[in-house]
Amino acid sequence: VLDASMDYLRYRYEEDQYLNSQDTLFGDMDGGIHLYSGQANLVWPFSKSFTFHAGAKTSFVSIDNNADYNRLQGDSWQPDHDLSCDFQYDENINAGYVQLDAKFSSISLEAGLRLENTRIEGEQSGNAYQRDSSFTNHYTHLFPTLSVQYALRNGNSLSLTYGKRIVRPNYRDLNPFVYIHDEYTYDKGNTLLRPELSDNLELAYIHGDLFRVGLAFNYTKDVIIKSYLDQGNYVVYVSPENLSS
């Protein structure tokens, strides 16, 4: 069995911010997202006991974010170049996988391998007040999976599973422009963020449909956390960063 599909998503947003404090600030933000994706999957039961799976997927994401901030100075509004920015983000992910399923009298086995390549480019041109924040990031990872289930008596079973997974930073966390919550708290993205990679292992005893008891192990590298940086003047910048392993 072979199936294929394609998708397109378009999203646009606009937001105004008005902060009335010691320094009156007005922000005009807008942006758009274009997402293209396509995938194909093959399922081939080539014998009574074995089934082969294979597939490929590609996705392209393009994001354009604009933030224009102005401060009230006297009776006129003046642009704030420290906070304003125009950020373009492009991401391409290509992936392919293979998996083999095997079923015998008392043992079921699933073994797979997925290869992913990610290419990211972000561009934020600098100005006299703000340095260039453009960046590129390319990485390739292999993700093996394994699941073994052994059937016991009376519908009970033992299972052993392993999988390697990835959690990518979301687009907002990579965006270097500043989002103002209030006069004391600013949000700012981090273009140097790396994805989280985790290894997960579980051994479980399954008692029919009643309950499941297991032992699990997880190791995660480059965990993404929120950091809080005091910039003085009672202003705190909240920014994501990778926790050192």
Question: What are the language-model segments listed below?
Answer:
Residues 1-123, 151, 211-213:
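Face-selective signature of the C-terminal outer-membrane beta-barrel domain
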